[in-house]
Curated annotation (Swiss-Prot):
It catalyses: 5,6-dimethylbenzimidazole + nicotinate beta-D-ribonucleotide = alpha-ribazole 5'-phosphate + nicotinate + H(+). This is Nicotinate-nucleotide--dimethylbenzimidazole phosphoribosyltransferase. The keyword RNA-binding does not apply. Pfam families: DBI_PRT. Its EC number is 2.4.2.21. Pathway: Nucleoside biosynthesis; alpha-ribazole biosynthesis; alpha-ribazole from 5,6-dimethylbenzimidazole: step 1/2. Belongs to the CobT family. The gene is cobT. The active site is at E317.
């Protein structure tokens, strides 16, 4: 059973602020639409933040980590112990997202929601009920109670960001085997063939991708995940702690009226699950980039999402969202800082 709060409605964006932002864009010293997506981003944030001065300076990053029993089937190019090793790298500042967050002045919190770590990792918040999921090729990955716990862990992590007074939030993930879990979730939610979704993940070759797809096909059949399967059942059968925590965190963010800048394939699968669980959260999700992972385009299409950038990224860790953040900040700076035709004494189009 999922927590009751999961289904609580999320507020709608402010239409009055959207209209005001659109009117301001029409008055700025440029042809209307000349700044393309930058104008759209500023207008959308103004509506989401219910403000005349949208911004993205306060943008905490929360990275959720978990291990996956399915890694025992050889679906990753890296061994499971890498997850815990990377926890230390995140906390020590040497991982890509740590560098990006530091450069962007974004607070970074790393949360262990289900890794194999038996001891506390300095600088990492531990909020878990189990060390790793079960191998979903032979058993359910999670119990319903563990799914609910992961949702709540995501909400708790989100609540800890309140002191930062977020203008938007970013979620990332780490977990050896999690592209397999994400692909299985996406295949079940979208009723797609796994071969159309499975990508290279951490660097699999063609044979590795074929093996990963076959593992997912067998698992979906084993668990009876047909097109009418409930989202909660899909998450329990083939999900991961960090993926479910992100879905919960997204819904909780939307319920607080905090926009979410969504990262790549795995985070987008969490977003798809979140939207299926609570459709009213969709409007609070902004999409940062199109990943090189094969299945990402299908997930984005299902969400009606139009990401800002496409740099062939496939690292995860929220690295794509962090890379897109400066574009959002610039969009807000232009919206807030440009002069109107009247202020600059420049003749408008109809003059």
């Amino acid at each position: 059973m999922l927590p009751d709060w999961i289904s609580l409605d999320c507020a709608a964006p402010s239409e009055s602020h959207r209209q005001a932002a659109m009117a301001r864009q029409a008055q700025l010293t440029k042809p209307l639409g000349a700044l393309g997506r930058l104008e759209e981003v500023a207008v959308e944030l103004a509506a989401l933040q219910a403000t005349d001065h949208p911004g993205a300076d306060r943008a905490p990053v929360v990275l959720f980590a978990g291990d996956h029993g399915i890694a025992a089937q050889g679906v990753s190019a890296y061994p499971p112990e890498v997850t815990v090793q990377m926890l230390r790298n995140f906390a020590g500042g040497g991982a890509a997202i740590a560098v990006l967050a530091r450069h962007l002045n974004c607070p970074l919190e790393v949360v262990d929601v289900g890794t194999l770590a038996s001891d506390a990792v300095p600088g990492v918040v531990a909020d878990k009920t189990r060390r790793g999921t079960r191998d979903f090729s032979v058993a359910q990955a999670l119990t319903p109670e563990e799914v609910a716990f992961a949702c709540d862990a995501g909400r708790r992590a989100l609540a800890r960001q309140a002191d930062h007074q977020p203008q938007l939030v970013i979620f990332g993930e780490m977990g050896i085997g999690n592209t397999t879990s994400a692909a299985a979730i996406a295949a079940a939610l979208l009723s797609c063939a796994p071969v159309d979704i499975v990508g290279s993940g951490t660097g699999l070759d063609a044979d590795g991708r074929a093996k990963k797809a076959a593992v997912i096909v067998a698992a979906l059949a084993r668990h009876g995940l047909t097109s009418d399967a409930a989202v909660a059942d899909i998450l329990a059968a083939v999900g991961g702690f960090e993926i479910i925590a992100m879905a919960g965190a997204m819904i909780a963010a939307a319920q607080r009226r905090w926009p979410v800048l969504v990262d790549g394939f795995i985070v987008s699968v969490a977003a798809l699950a979140a939207v299926r669980l609570n459709p009213s959260c969709r409007t609070w999700l902004l999409f940062s980039h199109r990943s090189a992972e094969r299945g990402h385009a299908l997930v984005l299409d299902a969400l009606g999402a139009h990401p800002l950038i496409d740099l062939d990224l496939r690292l995860g860790e929220a690295s794509g969202a962090a890379t897109a953040l400066p574009i959002i900040r610039l969009a807000c700076a232009l919206h807030n800082g440009m002069a109107t035709f009247a202020e600059a004494a420049v003749s408008g189009r109809d003059a």
